[in-house]
């Protein structure tokens, strides 16, 4: 008699357990779906057929201390060797676009200040890394590459100027006849490019920010390193630090969404060959990939 009375209670517990398991599974599947959607990329941009044919010299094919980075001789040397080039673009206070890596002028120009605070006239008074080379404008670099090899153009934002920078670069590229793609660490710059010129091949730069915290709060490191704003930027490619290339989210972007992978910055021939064997496009420096 006691066992008969306990049976309904047992069945209720069993049903409750099954419902709990089902709810947990549904929640996990929903989270997995949301996570996958957050990593969204755009597959098969028509530019890849050409862009994938090249290796890209990081800030030009520089040879310090004689040929400084992001200098016209470095870009000419890249073209002469048949390489594409990666470069960095800043917006000056007078609207000029300049090719330079850091916002801070100290490392490469040996003066205090921010490049965004300069005019073109002030920019041309500076010299690169103790040489006689000037900091080039974006126009000067584009003139070299227009009938030559492709460019990977990184948008270097500062002080929330992502919209103005993206607009200036897109408008200048409207009349450019050469081959190029655009990348940035700043997802808001890519959102601007997407809105202004959706046809442009665009890429999200990233890395494992937990290894190099870069002054970012933990949540920004997590979001940026795991590419969780892709659903807003919808990049055609992911340019990820080569040493961090095994990261789960990067691999998911490539496998699930078909994103093109670009690897930076490669400094050894064996790493370059490993990168290309994986189908990634290399951005290299400090060696000649064509030398045995």
Language-model features and meaning:
Residues 1-17:
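Short, Lys/Arg-enriched N-terminal segments with co-localized hydrophobic residues
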Residues 16-292:
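Phosphate-group recognition and catalysis centered on beta-loop-alpha active-site segments
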């Amino acid at each position: 008699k006691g066992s008969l009375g306990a049976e309904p209670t047992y069945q209720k517990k069993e049903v409750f357990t099954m419902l709990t398991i089902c709810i947990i599974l549904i929640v996990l599947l929903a989270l997995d779906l949301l996570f996958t959607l957050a990593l969204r990329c755009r597959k098969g941009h028509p530019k890849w057929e050409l862009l994938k044919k090249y290796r890209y010299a990081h800030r030009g094919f520089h040879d310090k201390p004689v040929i400084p980075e992001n200098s016209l001789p470095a870009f000419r040397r890249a073209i002469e060797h048949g390489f594409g080039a990666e470069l960095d673009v800043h917006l000056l206070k007078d609207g000029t676009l300049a090719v330079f890596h850091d916002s801070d002028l100290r490392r490469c120009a040996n003066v205090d200040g921010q490049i965004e605070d300069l005019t073109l006239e002030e920019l041309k008074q500076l010299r690169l890394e103790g040489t006689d080379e000037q900091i080039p404008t974006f126009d000067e670099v584009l003139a070299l590459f227009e009938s030559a090899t492709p460019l990977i153009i990184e948008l270097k934002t500062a002080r929330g100027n992502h919209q103005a920078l993206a607009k200036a670069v897109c408008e200048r590229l409207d009349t450019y006849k050469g081959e190029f793609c655009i990348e940035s660490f700043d997802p808001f710059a890519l959102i601007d490019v997407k809105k202004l010129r959706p046809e442009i091949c665009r890429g999200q730069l990233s890395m494992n920010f937990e290894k190099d915290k870069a002054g970012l709060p933990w949540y920004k490191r997590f979001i940026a390193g795991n590419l969780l704003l892709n659903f807003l930027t919808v990049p055609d490619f992911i340019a990820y630090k080569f040493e961090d290339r095994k990261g789960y989210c990067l691999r998911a972007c490539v496998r699930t969404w078909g994103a093109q992978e670009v690897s930076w910055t490669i400094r050894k021939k064996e790493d370059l060959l490993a990168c290309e064997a994986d189908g990634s496009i290399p951005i290299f420096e400090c060696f000649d990939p064509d030398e045995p």
